[in-house]
Amino acid sequence: MRKACAWLLALALCGAGSATAALRLKLDAPGLDPAQREASQRLLDEAADKLPPAFRERLDREIAVEWRDDLPANGMGQARGPERIALNRRYLADLTDGSAASRQTGRVHGTERRELLATLLHELTHVYDRARLWSPEEKREIRRCTRQEETLGRIAQPGDCRGQAGRRFTLSDDPRLLDLAGWPQRAGQRGRREAHNGFVLRSPDVYELSNPREFVAVNMEYFLLDPSYACRRPALYRYYQQRFGWAPQHSACAQSFAYLNAGRDFGQQPLGQLDPERVYEVDYLLAEANDNLVSRWGHTMLRLVICAPGRPRGPDCRLDLDQHLVLSYRAFVGDLQLSSWDGLTGAYPSRLFVLPLSQVIEEYTKVELRSLASIPLKLDREEVASLVERAAQSHWSYDGQYYFISNNCAVETLKLLRSGIPRRPLQSLDSITPYGVLEMLENRKLADPSVLDDPKEALRLGYRFDSFRDRYQAMFDVLKRRLHIPQDKVEDWLALPARERQPWFARADLRASAALLLLEQASLRRQLLLAQDELKRLYLGHLDNPAGDQRLEVAGKTFQQILDDSGFLSRPAELLEGGYGLPQAAEWKHLEEQTRERQARLRRLSDDLDREVRALLDPERRAELEANEANIKEIGAHLRELHKAAGGLMLP
């Protein structure tokens, strides 16, 4: 009986101990007067109250907090081991007399007292992170993956173990956290992470970019203290909420995200609102390869299939092409001539452009003569919303480095998919080419290529957009049959000088004239592209000395202004001075004013350049453009005469 009672007493005592087990903050206060002690204790109590309950329960230890005068002048505090935190004594007087509560620091937290509170929470997070307070499930997975890596090596390690073997921290080496924070997997490195964080824009504190440990601690400050954190960094807010099973109250968040449309129509307002609820599906948009330096592996993009306002989400949204947007990682080169060496060494910034689908279709199918394939990704509603949200975050915050080989459009898009969609099969994808990424998505049943099985149906439903090359060749075949033109390929015909094509016009019947008009328009687009390249080379050749070529004295300045002013379309963060993360409603008005003003200036500059640019071209190029335009005018008039003679309707 005594043994049974003793056992019950021990069990009761053990249960009582576990019920009260929690973090204890103890003020180590030698030499403090009562007022200093009281102010310090209030700070400690407030910090403890701000922490998530699970945080306090798991970090079951006593941590001493002391004031010291040997900390760096620019530092407010520092964790000194697992059971001690030091605060900078220079702030003690302000905390004691209450002036710290009103003294502004110029940082997001505002006052000196809030900064002290944030510092204490920051350092406590470091202690928590180093304590390896994993859940039982995490512990089992880490042990399993560590054993497998020790036995099989990194190369043979299963995909679901990437980043799990040998983990040392509670949060800061969690693969999911690293994806969200901006330290993604390196392409082809079996889970190794990038050394640098490219999310450098609109950061609340650049210290977070030092390493993942500081990122976790800095963001814990804002998670606990900033009610707008859930709206500014929603994915990270949800991450902390899931880790602790708790979250502080937050502001009401807008349902849509601001973005800047980088379309080339300077007459349109670029600022738009992207509502994830209107996104029906997301497609992997692939531009086929060609022989150009930067296009020989194809180009990877994502297409947002957005429903027209008022239309319920469904297959009919695929017909709302004017609403669809394209997410495209591109090397931002200031619109100058591409350098293969700079592309290999990462000299170009890599940014996420948001473009209208119509422009992308024209750019690839009509100008570059490349087909587009649009393959739906198999995502549920939550994943679609998460991916759109992550794209918006990247649009405002990411400014990476573009490498043609190791960090190109395919790699950047894969990083976006991994961070935006928390699905295990994505973590083991490894490819540096657009076709390679697509093949892996298909193999893992994440993409549906069956939509391309029927070519005609794919064209009708917008899963494929054919290159105009085949259409041009078909038009040229009409000329071959009716006019017996000696060239065999449309490319050979378009390569002829415009004046050599002109004599054939008078012999053309109605159908041949229509074909000639289409081909002359294609030739003009080609000439404009060549003229653009010529201007790039001219500008680049005199970049350091614009006065070295008299042609650049006037138009060159306009050209430079356009390059300078259009940069905001790929780096929208430069329009906002304050805040961090996703822009909030209070910042939208400023964005509207800034974008409207810059877009109007770009339109004026573009009109000026249109008038001045011909003077910059070589005489031969200028003559070819003028001859091409004259051809279009002549064949158009000839076509109208034939139409009239055939009894066709003539509009006034």
Go through each PLM region and give its residues.
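Bacterial N-terminal signal peptides
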Residues: 6-16
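Auxiliary, metal-adjacent structural segments of Zn-dependent hydrolase domains
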Residues: 22-98, 159-163
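Second-shell loop/turn segments in exported
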Residues: 29-38, 103-115, 202-207, 287-291, ...
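Glycine-rich catalytic cores of cysteine/serine-nucleophile enzymes that process amide/ester linkages
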Residues: 80-119, 278-369, 403, 611-621
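Activation targets extended, charge/polar-rich intrinsically disordered C-terminal tails
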Residues: 99-105, 130, 135-208, 218, ...
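Active-site recognition of the HExxH zinc-binding catalytic motif
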Residues: 114-132, 217
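Active-site-adjacent bridging/hinge elements
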Residues: 187-197, 272-279, 294-295, 299, ...
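N-terminal regions that are enriched for targeting/export leaders
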Residues: 241-289, 297-299, 312
